[in-house]
Each structure stands twice: as structure tokens, then as C-alpha cells.
């Protein structure tokens, strides 16, 4: 992944978004662009640790008067609550309505994901 991302960046690609590993992976951001190695799972029945959630990436690209591009990135962890496959963002607030085992998995995913991404 890193070799491919490096190759693409050297050849002018500014924004790279990966998804296949089914788990959230680190990202890189600098003045030349953003590499999101994996967004994890958005809607999935995979319930293994780290496979039961993902991140929503909001990227804003603006062009400066000199023609250069600027990138801003906002990452929002989300967790898939089953049954029903409800996407549950990190700001859900009320986890008390979740079954205890779901609440524990939700909190573990959010804690681990925030640590991984430095949020």
C-alpha cells in the first residue's frame, strides 16, 4: 500500500482513498494531499474486532489565488449497529439504549479508532 501510494503521489495524485482491508488504517496528510489507506467497513455484517466499523472522511479542496491546492480533512468514526445495520457516529451520545454487549463493542471501537487516527 505504501509503495503504491508513494508511486501515485510521485505521479501527481493528490487524494488516495483505500477501502478493501475491512479495517480502519492510518492516514497521511501533508501540503500535497491526503492518503487514506483504508476507511474500514461502512455497512457490514462483519462483527470481528476492528471490522465492525469505519470512518467517514470529509475532504475539502480549495484553490488558492496562486493556483495551488489546499486540503482539509475531517474524520468521523462510525460503528455498524446490528440488527438493522444502523450507522452510529462517534457523537451518538446515547449509548444506553444499546444492548450491553453492543455498547461495549461500540466504545472499544471508538476508543481504538480515535487512538489510531490521533483524534
What are these regions (language model features)?
Residues 1-55:
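Conserved beta-sheet core of the metallophosphoesterase superfamily
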Residues 52-119:
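A short C-terminal boundary segment appended to hydrolase-like catalytic domains
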Amino acid at each position: 500500500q505504501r509503495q503504491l501510494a508513494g508511486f501515485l503521489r510521485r505521479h501527481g495524485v493528490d487524494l488516495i482513498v483505500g477501502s478493501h482491508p475491512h479495517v480502519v488504517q492510518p492516514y497521511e496528510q501533508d501540503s500535497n494531499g491526503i492518503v487514506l489507506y483504508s476507511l474500514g467497513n461502512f455497512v457490514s455484517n462483519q462483527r470481528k474486532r476492528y471490522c465492525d466499523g469505519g470512518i467517514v472522511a470529509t475532504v475539502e479542496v480549495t484553490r488558492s489565488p496562486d493556483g495551488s491546492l489546499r486540503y482539509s480533512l475531517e474524520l468521523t468514526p462510525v460503528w455498524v449497529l446490528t440488527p438493522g445495520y444502523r450507522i452510529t457516529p462517534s457523537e451518538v451520545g446515547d449509548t444506553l439504549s444499546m444492548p450491553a454487549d453492543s455498547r461495549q463493542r461500540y466504545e472499544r471501537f471508538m476508543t481504538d479508532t480515535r487512538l489510531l487516527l490521533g483524534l
